[in-house]
Each structure stands twice: as C-alpha cells, then as structure tokens.
Regions:
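Structural signal for the C-terminal ends of transmembrane alpha-helices
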Residues: 24-34, 157-160
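Hydrophobic core of alpha-helical transmembrane segments in multi-pass integral membrane proteins
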Residues: 15-28, 49-65
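Interfacial loop-to-helix junctions that mark the boundaries of transmembrane helices
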Residues: 3-13, 40-46, 137
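Alpha-helical transmembrane segments in multi-pass membrane proteins
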Residues: 1-27, 76
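Transmembrane helix-loop-helix hairpins at the membrane interface
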Residues: 58-60, 71-182
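Membrane interface segments of multi-pass transport proteins and intramembrane proteases
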Residues: 2-6, 38-42, 101-111
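Membrane-interface helix caps and helix-loop-helix hairpins in membrane proteins
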Residues: 5, 63-73
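Cytosolic, membrane-interface loops and tails of multi-pass inner-membrane proteins
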Residues: 33-36, 97
Length: 182
C-alpha cells in the first residue's frame, strides 16, 4: 500500500474515458439518461439481487479487513474494482457500445461490444507491458473466447434484469475477489 497514489493514478487515467462518456451521455440525453443507460433499479427482485451482490462485496471486504495485514490495499481494491473496473467496463461496453448498436441485429449488438470488452483485457493479461506477438497469439487462443462469452453473459444479465447495476456488482465481486490472494 506504500505506492497507492501511483496505483490510483494508473487506475484513474483509463477511467477518464468512461467518466467522460458518462458526462457526455448525461448532457446529451438529459432526462432520458437514467432510463436509456439502464441506471435505474426498479422492482423488488432487482433491489434484492443488488443487495445480495453488494452484501457479497461488503462481506468479502469485512473478511479481508479482519484477516489481511494491508487494509489500505483492501479498501483501495474495493474502490478500484467497483468503480474503475465494475462500473467503468460495464458502462462503456454494456451501455455506451450497445446504445450505439441498439438498432443492429442481436449478433452484432452482442459480439461487437463484447469483443471490445475482451480486448480491454489484453494489456492486463500481459502485465501492462509491451504486447508481443506471442502475447497476442496466447490471448487470441486462450482468453478471447472466454472473455467474449462472459461479456455476452453480463450483457444478457443487463438486458434481462433491465439495469446495469446487477452486472456492475457481479463484475466487481468477481474481480474484487482477487483480494483473497494478497
């Protein structure tokens, strides 16, 4: 946790894209923004599902704050995986991209944003360093299909639930569970 300011800056820079898109869409869509971007929680089952996922995140946080020595890293990871990763990736891939493709046939509406989602993970898979030809081949053969399918499942979850918050919380919980390995 001694280099958290640098880690925060590193996480914040890529998050500027979703943040700018969020502000741009909010300004352009005005009153239609929450509905069109699936930012509402309506109905009992949506709220219960969101509470269950949030409880999972906070339960994991409480556990890690008790058993882990570096509590600052646990709290930073909570913020990082919920805001930068969970919300950032879901908003860009599941809201912005699908909004642009809303009139496209379902295979296009599912494949294009989720191939983009998969490609967002290429640099993470290479340790944020230079991407070599071998890295690219390994990513294309080992990771691309799984990440694309998981993205499609997140999108299906968003469309069936009618809210972006359930995929955001599920994505955050899945990625945040890495704190167990610290």
């Amino acid at each position: 946790s001694e280099d958290l300011p640098a880690a925060f800056r590193q996480g914040m820079i890529p998050f500027l894209i979703p943040l700018c898109l969020f502000l741009l869409f909010a300004a352009l869509l005005k009153r239609d923004f929450p509905e069109r971007m699936y930012l509402t929680l309506r109905g009992r089952w949506q709220r219960i599902a969101a509470l269950v996922l949030a409880a999972g995140i906070f339960g994991l946080t409480a556990y890690c704050l008790i058993v882990k020595e570096d509590r600052t890293a646990v709290l930073y990871s909570l913020f990082y995986y919920v805001v930068f990763i969970g919300f950032g990736e879901e908003f860009v891939c599941r809201d912005v991209c699908t909004d642009f493709l809303r009139n496209a046939a379902w295979p296009v509406r599912y494949l294009v944003p989720n191939l983009c989602f998969a490609m967002l993970h290429l640099f993470e898979r290479t340790g944020w360093g230079t991407v070599t030809g071998a890295d690219l081949v390994r990513f294309l053969t080992a990771d691309l299909a799984g990440l694309t399918v998981s993205g499609c499942l997140f999108q299906l979850f968003k469309e069936r639930s009618g809210t972006i918050w359930l995929p955001v919380l599920l994505h955050a919980l899945m990625d945040y569970s890495v704190v167990l390995t610290y």
